[in-house]
C-alpha cells in the first residue's frame, strides 16, 4: 500500500479537519502518500482528487467545517456510481480509503470494500447516532454551541418572563437535546426516545411561574417536531407568552472543542493502522475511552443507545 485516500461525506461536523489531519499525518509518518477527495463521493466519481502536502495541514486542526468539502451523493448507492468511483481510485493509484461521515457514508465505505478497496469509516456527525461508539466527531462541539446559545436565550427569557422552545439538531436521535438540556437546566427536554405529554409540560410551566420562576426553557429535538409547531400546541393549554427558536446550522460550524480534536486525532491515526494491517470494511469508534473497531455490517443491524436516563436526571434535579 502506497496511497491512502480521504473524504468527508454528508453533513459537516466540527472536528472533521482534525480527523483529516490525523489520517494524512499518520500516513506520511508511515511513508505513505495521502490524497484528499473533495465533495465526498460526488468528488470521487468526478475525479476531484489531489495529493495532500504537509503544508496543507497547517492550522486545520482548529478549523470548523471540512477542508475537503462535503456533499450528499445518493447515486453512489448504485453499482454504476461505485464503479465510476473505483475507476478514479485506480487512475490516481489510491490503494485504500478513509471515509469520515454518518451512516450514509458508511454504506459507501462498505460498497468500496466489497469491490476490493479496503475502506475504514470514521463517525463524523453532530447527531451522535452511530452505534458502537460513545461519541461521534462533532457532537461535543455542537452541544457546547447549543449551551452558549441557550444561555443567551435564558437571559432574554428571564428579562421578559417568557417561555422559549428551542429546537436543536440530532436528526432522529435525542442525544444533542438531552446533553444540551441538562447543561442549561431546562424546564423540559423533549426527545423521540422518551414519552412525553404536552399537558404535563404546560402544568410544570404554570407550577414554576406560581413559585416565582420567571422563565422556562424547553429543549426540543428536531426529530419530534419543529419549535413553532410545539409552541402552537403548547398554547392550547394556556397563555405562556412562548417563543419558538431554532439554533439550526450554527451547531455544525465553529472551532471544535479539545475533546473533538483529540478524539478525531485518535480515530484518524487508528484508521491508518487498520489499513496498514490489511483490514477494511470497519467502523472506528471509542467505547469506555478505548479505540474499537466493528464490521460496518454490524452497525446497520444495530441501533445507537441514547442515554435516556439524562431526561430522568433533569426531571429530578429541576426545581419543583
From Swiss-Prot:
Subcellular location: Cytoplasm
Superkingdom: Bacteria
Regulation: Allosterically activated by ADP and other diphosphonucleosides, and allosterically inhibited by phosphoenolpyruvate.
Principal location class: cytoplasm
One GO process term, biological-process aspect: fructose 6-phosphate metabolic process
Example of a GO MF term: identical protein binding
Keyword match Glycosyltransferase: no
Binding-site residues, substrate: 125-127, 162, 169-171, 222, 243, 249-252
Residue positions binding Mg(2+): 103
Catalytic reactions of this protein: beta-D-fructose 6-phosphate + ATP = beta-D-fructose 1,6-bisphosphate + ADP + H(+)
Record function comment: Catalyzes the phosphorylation of D-fructose 6-phosphate to fructose 1,6-bisphosphate by ATP, the first committing step of glycolysis.
GO cellular component entries: 6-phosphofructokinase complex
Protein name listed in UniProt: ATP-dependent 6-phosphofructokinase
Classification via Gene3D superfamilies: 3.40.50.450, Phosphofructokinase domain
Annotated residues for binding of ATP: 11, 72-73, 102-105
One Pfam family from the record: PFK
Cofactor: Mg(2+)
EC number: 2.7.1.11
Pathway assigned to this chain's UniProt record: Carbohydrate degradation; glycolysis; D-glyceraldehyde 3-phosphate and glycerone phosphate from D-glucose: step 3/4
Gene name, Swiss-Prot/TrEMBL: pfkA
Residue ranges of coiled coil: none
Keywords: Allosteric enzyme, ATP-binding, Cytoplasm, Glycolysis, Kinase, Magnesium, Metal-binding, Nucleotide-binding, Transferase
UniProt record similarity statement: Belongs to the phosphofructokinase type A (PFKA) family. ATP-dependent PFK group I subfamily. Prokaryotic clade 'B1' sub-subfamily.
Subunit (UniProt): Homotetramer.
Catalytic site positions: 127
